Structures are given as C-alpha cells and as structure tokens.
C-alpha cells in the first residue's frame, strides 16, 4: 500500500514584535490511496456573462445584437421560436405531452343549403311525393288484378296482395267526401276487380270456352241520383248485354243507400262473322275448332239478316221483386282515374272509362 503525504501550512498572525521571524509549521498526514474505475470528466471552467449595472452609463451601452447568455458549458442556447399568431394553442395531457387543440367548427343556425324560394316549397315537394306514391300504387293494383278475369281466377295470395294495396290507397284517399264531389263521382266506371260473392256465378259463366265477360261497368249520375250497372257477354256468334237500374239516397258524404228498380235485357248483337278460336280447352283437353269454323262460314249471311231483324226490337225489362234489390255502397277512395267502393261485404275496384289504367 502506498502512502501519500500532504503538506499543511499553518499561518500565524504576525507578532507584534517585528523582530521575531515567521516560522511555518509543516505536518505530514498520511492518507489512504483509493482507486476508482469511474472516469470523471474534468470540470469546465465557468464563464460568467457580463452583468449589466442597473444604472446605465454612457460608456456601457447595449451592443447592437443584444447580450447573449451562455450556459455552464459555454454554449449559447437556441432561442425558442415564437409560435405564429394563428397557430392553435398546445394542451398538455396527464403524461406531460403536448397536443395541438382542434379548432372548433363554427356553429351557425343556418343550413349550408339555400333556403326555399318560397314558404310553400316543402309542402309542394311533399305533395309531389304523395302523388308519385299514389300513382305507383294504382299501377301496381292494375298490374296485380290483370289476368284474374275480374277476380274470379284470383288465388288467395293475389287476393291478399290486392287487399294490401287497397288499404294503402284508402289511407291516401284525396277525396274525403266523394258524394259531395260530383265532378269526380259522375261518369262511367269500368270494373277491374271484385270480391263480391253475388257476382261469382256470372263470372263463372263468363269463364266458359264459348262465353266471355266482355265488360262490367257502372254509370253514376248525382243529379238524378241514379246508378246503371251494365254487363256485356261475348260469344263467337253474338254479344249479349243486360243492365240493372237503381236509385240511391245520400246517407253520409261517402255512403249511399242503393235500391235497384228493374233489369233490362237488350237484343243480342249478331256478329257478321263467326268469331271462333282455333281451339278450346275442355276439362284439360284441347279441342280443335278449325273444322267447325269452316262449316259455319256459309251461315254468315243468315246471321246478318237475323241481326238486322232484331236490332230494332225494344229491350226486355224485368222488375226486381221485393227488397232484394236494396244495398249500400261506401266509397273509400276516389280520384280522377280510380274508385274503390265497398258494399255488403264486397269489394269493387273500378277505373274511369278512358283512363290510362285500362291500358296497362
């Protein structure tokens, strides 16, 4: 082990007697030698910047670039850049990290879109949407009942679909008082579909191979308070028409009481040529009628003579017995093209004669 010696000098105050000389004392004090593996960086000398006096003087003037401040290592720290005026303020979170705050969007009571040009613009748009929806429902109803032979051949699914569309149209009824709107109620209405049980025998007869229901229509006249129901049957030889005349009384703005008076059987209209189909289906079998059609061609002249003879005959009128001709009719939907009515448990869907619904 090495031993270090340190020299300590002790100074004493000068004696009052100058004749005595100064004698320093030397003491040797051993210290233990220690080794350290840690490298110590020699300290750098501290530099102190010039301290300005609080009282300015003429000779001590501030330099042109201002005073610079150095740290303990003699390096000049970079001055922090001042944030721009429009920069978002930083927010410190719980971890001490700074995040830029998101600028809030400007809140305004006015919508970005232009305001309506007039107060009724939104009402007009809603009205247009209602008209488009109603027209689509009417077209869908006409397409659904097409090919059902006025409802006689409609299955349960088709009947349920028709009833659903009818309910939607009744909810959009634009005419709440049909009887009080003769300009819409009056006229000739063509039957598109019915679920009236009393018409089923007639529709069944019209589904035979040589007899078809050509049309069923209803004419209403609010001035005379009368209704005329007409039916036309078509065969290869002639067309047969009969009608039922009734009077009605207004019970409510949408309901009338109907009383049938008499039925009328018009003379048949003999066709100038026999209009036979090429074949007919009977009990699931197809029967060819070409030979029968050729055999009846010589009888066309005879049929024309019969037609001219009976064309001038008056129609045959038959009265309705008792109260069997009484009924009621409730109109649940009415516009310029379509009318929906209910009566005695039956449903009637009719289109105005000449309407585009008949062309679908």
From Swiss-Prot:
InterPro entries: PAP, PAP/fibrillin_dom. Residues 117-127 have a biased composition (Acidic residues). Keywords: Chloroplast, Plastid, Transit peptide. The keyword Transit peptide applies. The keyword Transferase does not apply. Induction: Down-regulated by drought and oxidative stresses. Up-regulated by wounding. Residues 38-50 have a biased composition (Basic residues). It is found in: Plastid, Chloroplast. GO terms for cellular component: chloroplast. Its main location: plastid. Residues 1-130 are annotated as: Disordered. This is Plastid lipid-associated protein 3, chloroplastic.
